Structures are given as structure tokens and as C-alpha cells.
Amino acid sequence: MVQTGNLQRDLPPRLFAEEAFTTLVDRPGLRIECIVSTGRVIPEGQWYDQETDEWVLLVEGAARLRIEGESEDRLLAEGDWILLPAHCRHRVTWTRTELPPTVWLAVHFVPEE
């Protein structure tokens, strides 16, 4: 079955204190999500540590991402993408707090052996 959508048109109608996750595709070994962030910060010392590789595109907005072991945050702007290997510990240190929100497209997939 053919499925369609629009990341920007289908955004939540208001700002949220937490991130809003929408799964667009979920197949064995592959998950694609739209993530909407407004003022999202992962506290110091807490990290995402995922079993899958994650390719992330910043569709709209702006964000800062910290990779464990790096001394500086990475500033991400619209159109920037990053590939995070499985178990690459990372955290979001800042996203915009005003409208439009920060919109991410995240593709999670099984790492190569």
C-alpha cells in the first residue's frame, strides 16, 4: 500500500514541553520517525545510547547536539544531517523554544556487521 504525508503540514498544532515522536515507517531493521522538539534538553550526564545506527536530518529549526567525548556541542541548522553509529552516546543540549519548532527526521537501522 502506498502511504504519503507531509512532515511540515502534519506537525502538532501547539508547543510541547517534551519531544513529540511520530513513527512514519516501522519494519524489521528499519524505523523512520518525525521528532518535534521545543526547548528540549537532555540533562547533563544523561545520554541516548541506541542499539541501532541513526541517521538524523534537521528539517526545520535549530539544535545543539553533544557527542560523548567531544568538547564542543555541534550546532545543527536546517538541512544538516548526522550519522550516529549504534552506541554513540549523544544528547540534545538545546532546541528552539519558539514556533516553528525544531523538526527532525530520524532513520534508525541495523548496523553493518
Region roles according to the model:
Residues 29, 70, 97-99:
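Short strand-connecting beta-turns/loops that link adjacent beta-strands
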Residues 48-50, 55-78, 93:
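A short beta-strand-loop-beta hairpin characteristic of the jelly-roll/cupin
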Residues 28-30, 38-42, 60-64, 88, ...:
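Short, charged/polar surface micro-motifs in flexible loops or helix N-caps
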Residues 20-22, 62, 79, 89:
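Short, acidic/polar N-cap/turn motifs at the starts of alpha helices
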Residues 1-47:
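A short, N-terminal "cap"/entry segment at the start of jelly-roll beta-barrel domains
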Residues 77, 86-113:
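Ligand-binding loop in jelly-roll beta-barrel domains
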